């Protein structure tokens, strides 16, 4: 018989708003929660006995998989993966896209990215971990040739699972993907794995603002996503990143797109230090792109993260002559707060900023609740005050 867990008003309210991760703190009968095995199916009820959802117990939380009383078995996993894939195909995605985006696709704690015939898998739900073989079998049935697992980081630890990186099926470890007119080499080797698919729409949008001969600074450029799109439109690009391996791949991506070597330069270094040096040297760029890693993965880290974002954007605004493209993938930082801090940072840099466009994550990362929206991307016109 499935264990019944009752939640307080905070837990009830969270589920009503579409948040399907319920911390142990919101569970009233904690003794029952503690007594069952990790990975077991549990039913969530309100204090008054209203059924709210069904999911898997994890060490510190329950990850709700469904709001119905249905079996969370192998067929459930298989059907939801197939349905999630069909949804992307209906949206027009073909070869490269996020196939499964955790709770948005009723597979809470599972992320699958597809790169042609290679898929990467991330699992941070103990219940899904127990059915990993089904995930692999389903992907193979859908025509995937090779599967690479990259289950690591904070969410993996919360699930009480060891970090795992390696091939689950097949032998391929690299492929070439197409994004608009741009091509990118994507590798799967345990260090810099995959490609940030969530920025697809924003990278394509960037091309509309680039003019022939523009000087572009791409901060935290990774493997050159924004850089390549800018270069394709005739820009001269300077990319900055801490990872030597990522920058090597960025250079390969420039070569792959037949960009002359005198039109790009990649600098290995700390973004803040490099930008400070550029400011001291009086450097200016027509376009500055800021796409840093998440500064805050929890609300506790938000205060220091805001300071970091403010400094980064202040430096970026000082260096930008015409356009500032700035991003944040910190989920706890809300869109309005991000807009406000960017505008303030521009003012502190003596720049008058006008928001041209606000972008979010690509639609293959569907937003179904506040908790599933994380990416923010602002396009701003900037001019001297």
Swiss-Prot record:
Top-level taxon of origin: Archaea
Localization per Swiss-Prot or TrEMBL: Cytoplasm
Keyword Transferase in record: yes
GO biological process: methylation; rRNA processing
Entry EC no(s): 2.1.1.-
GO terms assigned for molecular function: methyltransferase activity; RNA binding
Keyword line: Cytoplasm, Methyltransferase, RNA-binding, rRNA processing, S-adenosyl-L-methionine, Transferase
Keyword Transferase found: yes
UniProt xrefs under InterPro entries: PUA (IPR002478), PUA-like_sf (IPR015947), PUA_sf (IPR036974), RlmI-like_PUA (IPR041532), SAM-dep_methyl-trfase (IPR019614), SAM-dependent_MTases_sf (IPR029063)
Domain annotation PUA: ranges: 2-81
Top-tier EC class: transferase
Single GO cellular component term: cytoplasm
Family: Belongs to the methyltransferase superfamily. RlmI family.
The protein's name: Putative ribosomal RNA large subunit methyltransferase MJ1653
Source organism (scientific name): Methanocaldococcus jannaschii (strain ATCC 43067 / DSM 2661 / JAL-1 / JCM 10045 / NBRC 100440)
């Amino acid at each position: 018989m499935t264990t019944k867990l009752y939640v307080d008003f905070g837990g009830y309210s969270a589920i009503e708003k579409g948040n399907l991760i319920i911390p142990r703190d919101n569970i009233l009968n904690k003794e029952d929660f503690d007594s069952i095995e990790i990975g077991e199916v549990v039913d969530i009820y309100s204090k008054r006995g209203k059924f709210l959802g069904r999911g898997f117990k994890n060490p510190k939380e329950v990850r709700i998989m469904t709001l119905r009383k249905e079996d969370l078995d192998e067929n459930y996993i298989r059907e939801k993966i197939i349905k999630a894939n069909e949804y992307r195909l209906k949206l027009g995605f073909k070869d490269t896209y996020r196939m499964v985006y955790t709770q948005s696709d009723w597979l809470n704690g599972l992320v699958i990215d597809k790169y042609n015939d290679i898929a990467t898998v991330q699992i941070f739900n103990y219940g899904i971990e127990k059915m990993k073989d089904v995930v692999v079998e389903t992907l193979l049935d859908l025509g995937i040739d090779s599967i690479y697992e990259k289950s690591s980081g904070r969410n993996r630890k919360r699930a009480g699972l060891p970090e795992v990186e390696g091939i689950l099926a097949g032998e391929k470890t690299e492929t070439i993907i197409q994004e608009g007119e741009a091509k990118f080499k994507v590798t799967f080797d345990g260090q810099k794995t995959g490609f940030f698919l969530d920025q697809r729409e924003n990278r394509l949008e960037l091309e509309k603002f680039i003019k022939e001969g523009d000087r572009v600074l791409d901060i935290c450029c990774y493997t050159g996503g924004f850089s390549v799109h800018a270069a394709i439109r005739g820009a001269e690009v300077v990319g900055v990143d801490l990872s030597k391996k990522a920058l090597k791949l960025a250079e390969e991506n420039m070569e792959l797109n037949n960009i002359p070597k005198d039109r790009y330069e990649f600098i290995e270094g700390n973004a803040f230090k490099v930008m400070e040096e550029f400011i001291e040297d009086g450097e200016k760029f027509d376009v500055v792109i800021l796409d840093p890693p998440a500064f805050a993965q929890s609300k506790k880290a938000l205060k220091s993260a805001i300071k970091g974002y403010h400094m980064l954007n202040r430096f970026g605004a000082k260096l930008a002559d015409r356009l500032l493209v700035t991003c944040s993938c910190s989920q706890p930082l809300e869109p309005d707060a991000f807009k406000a801090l960017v505008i303030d940072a521009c003012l502190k840099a003596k720049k008058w900023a006008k928001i041209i466009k606000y972008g979010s994550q690509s639609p293959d990362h569907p937003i179904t609740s506040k908790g599933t929206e994380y990416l923010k991307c602002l396009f701003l016109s900037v001019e001297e005050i």
